[in-house]
Amino acid sequence: MKNRLPADFLWGNSVSSMQTEGAWNEGGKGMSVYDIRQPAEFASDWKVATDSYHRYREDFDLMQDLGMNCYRFQIAWSRVCPDGDGEFNEQGIAFYHQFIDELLARGIEPMICLYHFDMPLSLAERYNGFTDRRVMDAFIRYGQKMIACYGDKVKYWLTFNEQNLYHSPEAFLISGYLQGEKTLRELYLIQHHVMMAHVHLTHYLHQTKPQCLMGGMLAHALVYPATCKPRDILCAQQLDEFLNQNLLRAYAGEGYSPEVMHFVAAEGFDDIYRPEDLALMATVKVDYLAFSYYASRTLNSDAIPPGTAVNNYMLFGNQDNPFLKATEWNWQIDPLGFRTIITRYYNDWRLPVFPIENGIGVIESWDGEHPIADDYRIAYHRDHINAMKAAIFEDGAQVIGYLGWGLIDILSSQGDMRKRYGVVYVNRENHDLKDLRRVPKKIYAWLKQVFRSNGEAM
């Protein structure tokens, strides 16, 4: 008998608010940290993005035509609560009600992510973002309000996009941190406050909307040791423990990793972890494990200076993998790594797995006439979907669905419109908005047959 994916398997798209919405000063929205970022040669400002605030119905029609039945989007905190901890903006709340209703009317399951790096500017300026527990409290309040508003319409929830990034040096770029020395202690303050906000909101969702599901999400780049040298293997294992397994253990209700907590105590940071925090954490478990995946990485321990904190290993030890092809951004294409992560998640934690970001970013420019011929994107998605199928049918993993990233072109995470992931081209450049026209690429027809056949027609 031929293996087939479940009839309710989810196929779709995943985005953030600041990379899509635009309308930075409309509808009562407050300022976020992105609104003060300055454009550069290869970075747009964030004022318009792809204008989905005004064009979302057009985008939803394309998604429906493709056969998508899931859309993961993010609520802009400063759109629904301009200062982050003050009065809620009813106009912003109404916008997302209409947004969700338009998805549901097209048979598309919404998934809400509550935070994707765009801290309300007021909280960043007053408290330096998630270094301060008051920002954690403000986020919990905001999240509870969103769950109360939309929990009867939306089944799938996430608190934080790619939560393990708060365990890496990137934490200072995404947590509302505006000033300071970027110390290791501050890094652990940020990661714990983010984790506890997740714990409180998972508990609240389960208590108030038991029909809803909360996920925990990582940015998971499988890290290989550069050689079979024992130290390479040890360092790769340590990095995985600190950046990935530590959170996976917490998501599964086991608390933080003993190895990480031993390090915390040795550094004198254990006062960050209040007993009541750890007690609550031990009672909370997510409903599914989500992750983004684009590439794997390779770690050379010889390049890591003595005394380097595990969180910072990749600043020094990152190495190209000679066995993998890479994108022009030097992201190493590795479908087998995708399978490995899915299978390991399910083997280790027995929780449903949901890969909710996957894709290939390429510099593309439309000639105004012919569709972008992105055969490389067809190959990338085909190989990764087949790897996911192998995890399901050969390894026994339980998988909820497959979401691509930015399948209608969006600004990159750095604001660079040149780097495109979409199956639909959005006609704008970094500093020329043009007409923002949506133009299907070659992959559009292929992905449509994949989605509409539930992964059969590859």
PLM region descriptions:
Residues 8-10, 53, 70:
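A common structural microfeature
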Residues 30-61, 66:
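Aromatic- and Gly/Pro-rich amphipathic surface segment
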Residues 55-76, 283-289:
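Catalytic domains of carbohydrate-active enzymes, especially glycoside hydrolases
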Residues 75-88:
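Glycine-rich, proline-tolerant flexible connector loops at the mouths of alpha/beta enzymes
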